[in-house]
UniProtKB/Swiss-Prot annotation:
Pathway: tRNA modification; tRNA-queuosine biosynthesis. This is S-adenosylmethionine:tRNA ribosyltransferase-isomerase. HAMAP family: QueA. Keywords: Cytoplasm, Queuosine biosynthesis, S-adenosyl-L-methionine, Transferase. It comes from Nitrosococcus oceani (strain ATCC 19707 / BCRC 17464 / JCM 30415 / NCIMB 11848 / C-107).
Length: 344
C-alpha cells in the first residue's frame, strides 16, 4: 500500500486560517461509506443524522498552551513545545533552536522562568522547570496555544478559546481534537433533548499527529505514541448501545484511535496507557460505526484512518467534491459525517 494512494491536490486558499465567527457555523459533508453517496449540509443539521439509539463519544482532552519562547544561556533564541507532563515540574518537549542544547544547560523563558535540560529521550528533551508553580499553571501564564504548522499566522487571543472544545476537561494535549470544535452549547442541548446519549474518552493528542509519513510503503510507518483512557463507564454505554442496535458515533479520529485501541481483542474493554495503533485500509473496526471528522492533510495517518473507515475511493471522491464546492479544510475548517463501509 503506497503513500501516493493517499494524495490529493488542495488549493491553498481552502486551508482555513481562522475559525468561523461562531461554533457550529461550519458546513457538513455527509458520506455513506457503503455507497459513496455524499450530501452537502450544515453542521447544525447533525441531529437529523442521528437516532435515539446512537451514542456520541467525545474526546475530553484539553489543549495546553504548550509553546514557549525563550533564549539559551548563550543568547540564542529557542522555542519549546511541550509534548507531555512527567510530573508537576518536569516534561518531555520538542526544542527548536539552531543548535539543540545539551544536558545540564539552562534556558531562560518568558517571565524569566528558568528551565534545566536534563537529557534526551529519542527526539524529545527532558526538561525541569525551576519555578514553584505547577506546570499547568505556569503554562497558562507564559505559554501560547500550539497552532498547527499549516495555520501560517501568529497566535491571536481568540485561539485560546476557539482552539479548544467547550467540554475539554483533561489537560494534556498539544493539538485539539478538531471535530469537537464545531459543537456549541445550544447544539449539545438539542442533542440531549432529542434523546441522543453521549460519553467521553481521553486521548492526549501529541505533536506526532502532524508527523509526516516518510516511507513509500505505509505499512512500514512507525506510529507515534499517545496516552489513552477508556473507562468502564463508557464501555458499558457502548455495550448497551450495541445490544440495542444503535451506532457508536466517534467525534474525531482521536476518539476512533482510543476506542479501537481498547477493542484490540475484538470487544471493548477498559484501557489506560499508551497506544501506537496505526489504522489504515484493511483494518477491521470493532466498535465505531460512524465518524464525525474534519478534512485531513494528504498523505497523513489521519486520512489513512478515514480511508480505512469508508474506503479510499469513496473518501477521495468526497474530498474532490468538497474542493469543488469550496469547503474549508483542516483544523479550523468544515466537517464530515461518515458511516462505515462494511467489509463483512
Amino acid at each position: 500500500m503506497q503513500l501516493s494512494d493517499f494524495t490529493y491536490n488542495l488549493p491553498k486558499q481552502l486551508i482555513a486560517q481562522y475559525p468561523p465567527k461562531r461554533r457550529g457555523e461550519s458546513r457538513l459533508l455527509s458520506l455513506e461509506g457503503a455507497s459513496g453517496i455524499v450530501k452537502d449540509r450544515q453542521f447544525i443539521e447533525l441531529p437529523e443524522l442521528l437516532s435515539t439509539k446512537d451514542l456520541l463519544i467525545f474526546n475530553n482532552t484539553k489543549v495546553i498552551p504548550a509553546r514557549i519562547q525563550g533564549t539559551k544561556d548563550s543568547g540564542g533564541k529557542i522555542e519549546i513545545l511541550i509534548e507531555r507532563f512527567l510530573d508537576q515540574h518536569r516534561a518531555l518537549a520538542h526544542i527548536r533552536a539552531n543548535n539543540p542544547p545539551r544536558a545540564g544547560r539552562r534556558l531562560v523563558m518568558e517571565q524569566s522562568v528558568e528551565v534545566e535540560v536534563k537529557g534526551r529521550v529519542k527526539e524529545l528533551f527532558e526538561l525541569r522547570f525551576l519555578d514553584p508553580r505547577p506546570l499547568p499553571q505556569l503554562l497558562e501564564a507564559i505559554g501560547q496555544m500550539p497552532l498547527p504548522p499549516y495555520i501560517q499566522r501568529k497566535t491571536v487571543p481568540v485561539d485560546k478559546e476557539r482552539y479548544q472544545t467547550i467540554y475539554a476537561s483533561r489537560p494534556g494535549a498539544v493539538a485539539a481534537p478538531t471535530a469537537g470544535l464545531h459543537f456549541d452549547k445550544p447544539l449539545l442541548k438539542r442533542l440531549q433533548a432529542q434523546g441522543i446519549r453521549s460519553g467521553y474518552i481521553t486521548l492526549h493528542v501529541g505533536a506526532g499527529t502532524f508527523q509526516p509519513v516518510r516511507v513509500k510503503n505505509i505499512t512500514q510507518h512507525q506510529m507515534h505514541s499517545e496516552y489513552v483512557e477508556v473507562s468502564e463507564q463508557i464501555c458499558a454505554q457502548i455495550r448497551d448501545t450495541q445490544q440495542a442496535g444503535g451506532r457508536v458515533v466517534a467525534v474525531g479520529t482521536t476518539t476512533v484511535r482510543a476506542l479501537e485501541a481498547a477493542s484490540a481483542k475484538g470487544v471493548i474493554a477498559p484501557y489506560q496507557g499508551e497506544t501506537e495503533i496505526f489504522i489504515f485500509p484493511g483494518h477491521r473496526f470493532h466498535t465505531v460505526n460512524a465518524l464525525i471528522t474534519n478534512f485531513h492533510l494528504p498523505e497523513t495517518t489521519l486520512l489513512m484512518l478515514v480511508c480505512a473507515f469508508a474506503g479510499s475511493e469513496h473518501v477521495l471522491a468526497a474530498y474532490r467534491h468538497a474542493i469543488k464546492k469550496g469547503y474549508r479544510f483542516f483544523s479550523y475548517g468544515d466537517a464530515m459525517f461518515i458511516t462505515e463501509a462494511k467489509t463483512g
